[in-house]
Amino acid sequence: MFSTSAKIVKPNGEKPDEFESGISQALLELEMNSDLKAQLRELHITAAKEIEVGGSRKAIIIFVPVPQLKSFQKIQVRLVRELEKKFSGKHVVFIAQRRILPKPTRKSRTKNKQKRPRSRTLTNVHDAILEDLVFPSEIVGKRIRVKLDSSRLIKVHLDKAQQNNVEHKVETFAGVYKKLTGKDVIFEFPEFQL
């Protein structure tokens, strides 16, 4: 039998904690006895977190390497269904593990000779997290409402076609996004108008 850490590869060779080992074990079991075996064999995760969203509900965030995100998304709907069964109805979301590089200032410019790629900027990473979060639904529009006290509220418009699949998870998405980025977000399913 494989070890529980077979499905989790932490950066810098850190040891996975108990919760991450549990997730890893669940993925291993799915790989052993489900028809996802071929797709899951090549894939691994980098971290997992459990957070509280909206009062008493808990959500599980699973971080995956960016190059493997596409492969995970091919089987994500079934994988999430199986994992939610295993973890008694906790919502499961998959997000790519992205890195944000600090903005180059006058003082720090000498250290990194290379220009910071767009994909490592805070704005881009936060947008990408939002897209990973709502998968398999798609973001069709976005409105940022700045209130008088200069706090921001992001209204995200999701694809009406996917409303039945993701509507019950909208609160979880908002909670997870707030936890990861500190930004408030509301999800809506607007009627499409030209």
From Swiss-Prot:
Coiled-coil region list: none
Alphabetized PROSITE patterns for the sequence: RIBOSOMAL_S7E
One Pfam match: Ribosomal_S7e
Molecular function, one GO term: structural constituent of ribosome
Disulphide bridges, residue numbers: none
Single GO biological process annotation from the record: ribosomal small subunit biogenesis
Localization per Swiss-Prot or TrEMBL: Cytoplasm, Cytoskeleton, Microtubule organizing center, Centrosome; Cytoplasm; Nucleus
Keyword Cytoplasm set for record: yes
Keywords, alphabetical: Cytoplasm, Cytoskeleton, Nucleus, Ribonucleoprotein, Ribosomal protein
Main location: cytoplasm
Record has Cytoplasm as a keyword: yes
One GO cellular component term: centrosome
Family stated for the protein in its record: Belongs to the eukaryotic ribosomal protein eS7 family.
Cited function: Component of the small ribosomal subunit. The ribosome is a large ribonucleoprotein complex responsible for the synthesis of proteins in the cell. Required for rRNA maturation.
Quaternary state and interactors: Component of the small ribosomal subunit.
Protein name as it appears in the record: Small ribosomal subunit protein eS7
Organism: Danio rerio (Zebrafish)
